[in-house]
Amino acid sequence: MAVDITLLFRASVKTVKTRNKALGVAVGGGVDGSRDELFRRSPRPKGDFSSRAREVISHIGKLRDFLLEHRKDYINAYSHTMSEYGRMTDTERDQIDQDAQIFMRTCSEAIQQLRTEAHKEIHSQQVKEHRTAVLDFIEDYLKRVCKLYSEQRAIRVKRVVDKKRLSKLEPEPNTKTRESTSSEKVSRSPSKDSEENPATEERPEKILAETQPELGTWGDGKGEDELSPEEIQMFEQENQRLIGEMNSLFDEVRQIEGRVVEISRLQEIFTEKVLQQEAEIDSIHQLVVGATENIKEGNEDIREAIKNNAGFRVWILFFLVMCSFSLLFLDWYDS
């Protein structure tokens, strides 16, 4: 049984805060001002990324704890008939499947969003590597929780198939109903006789005439318990047919079990490939953004080169015109 340790946790947090505050005062009382400023600025890297990453890890951990807590009731197809505690209906199991899939999809989108923002922000190489490692760890944690959910779902589907197979193999209740109706008739006859006692006193001969055929049929029924050879052969053929049907059902169940296991394995592979494709799409997006920025810079350089080339042409034309005028002036002066 879980124990509430909230008060102990709060006391521990308060003790740690007091100790850190005391250490901060001791460091701040030093002579070196630059050292004091360094210690003051040290908590600055704790930003939005760390809090959001911790939040995603907390959500994934809650999902894992929830799946493990309700594992027995979730995978047990007979929990609603075995005990009143831990009862879970198929509707609740379907709701758990739907909520878990939505939750895992949301966590995956949050991880990809954190990865995109980490690539966009300008940080040192060490910070980028640290954030990439943190996101890889969170993604691996999510994959393990997805694998746990896939295994539980495969076990549940397998047990549901077994339950349906067993329900198909239950005997038909025709003989039981016939026996119950005959016993009810026999039990009701004394009560009717007791209720209709005044009428029977008036007509005893008629009642005896009615009861004698009933006793005769009862004795005939006892004699009919012995089966003839034709009936025995017919029942043996029916038994052989039922055995063949059960064997075919067992074979079908084994095939379905193999297919369910294969589907769960393919689902795990599909989930892993989808996460890999999301990471590749994100990296392609980053490359496209970088290529777009490079194209913009190249266009700016081309514009600057065109402007510089135009100015250079103007100076060349000016030089040629001045040279022409100088030659004309010298020719006129010489003549």
From Swiss-Prot:
GO terms for molecular function: SNAP receptor activity. SUPFAM superfamilies: SNARE fusion complex (SSF58038). Keywords: Coiled coil, Endoplasmic reticulum, ER-Golgi transport, Golgi apparatus, Membrane, Protein transport, Transmembrane, Transmembrane helix, Transport. It holds the Pfam family Syntaxin-18_N. GO terms for cellular component: endoplasmic reticulum membrane; Golgi membrane; SNARE complex. Residues 168-208 have a biased composition (Basic and acidic residues). InterPro entries: Syntaxin-18_N, Syntaxin/epimorphin_CS. The chain crosses the membrane at residues 310-330. Residues 168-226 are annotated as: Disordered. Residues 331-335 are vesicular. GO terms for biological process: intracellular protein transport; retrograde vesicle-mediated transport, Golgi to endoplasmic reticulum. Residues 243-305 form the t-SNARE coiled-coil homology domain. It is found in: Endoplasmic reticulum membrane; Golgi apparatus membrane. Residues 1-309 are cytoplasmic. It is a single-pass type IV membrane protein. Its main location: endoplasmic reticulum. Component of a SNARE complex consisting of STX18, USE1L, BNIP1/SEC20L, and SEC22B. RINT1/TIP20L and ZW10 are associated with the complex through interaction with BNIP1/SEC20L. Interacts directly with USE1L and BNIP1/SEC20L. Belongs to the syntaxin family. Syntaxin that may be involved in targeting and fusion of Golgi-derived retrograde transport vesicles with the ER. This is Syntaxin-18. The lineage of its organism: Eukaryota, Metazoa, Chordata, Craniata, Vertebrata.
